Amino acid sequence: MIKTKITEMLNIKHPIVQGGMHYVGFAEMAAAVSNAGGLGIITGLTQPTPDDLAKEIARCHEMTDKPFGVNLTFLPGFAAPDYPGYIKAIIEGGIKIVETAGRSPEAFMPPLKEAGIKVIHKCTSVRHALKAEKIGCDAASVDGFECGGHPGEDDIPNMILLPRAAEELKIPFIASGGMGNAQQLVAALAMGAEGINMG
């Protein structure tokens, strides 16, 4: 067992967080990760409506008594999802950890913080991680260019990005992108991360 600021903050055994993954992050996977000692994540927008997310959260509670979280990605667009509805489902479902991604979660921080929810924001640069810290996020997921899905615009690999994040951030951060085994976990910890994000 490795004890870090992230394991203590999230009340997990291992400093491993399952990243939100569209069309994959269902209750079964989240519960399996949480039962193994990491932090499982349900991908919020994989659920078509807030009511569907509420049902998925309830299913996950039936499969694990360990902490798990919900990913909520804020996307630009003309027809935004019902973010207030998803946040209501998260709060009413007793979720205490939310992983945010995409645009800044600043507009949605008040209800999350009022509910006592820990917010981890995915960032592809140190400047975005500093902004996450400034708006009250509890931790950052620092995503190097190796990450899948949404690698950002700066193309900075983790070997450069993680040590810079460690120099600048006061909040704990986890390393994301290219993390897949114990050696990479150890390397991430050596570069200042408090854990890793896989998936």
Segments from the language model and where they lie:
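Active-site entrance/lid segments in N-terminal catalytic domains of soluble metabolic enzymes
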Residues: 1-168, 172
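Active-site-proximal glycine-rich helix-loop-beta segment
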Residues: 36-37, 136, 192-194, 199
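Catalytic alpha/beta core domains of metabolic enzymes, predominantly
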Residues: 156-198
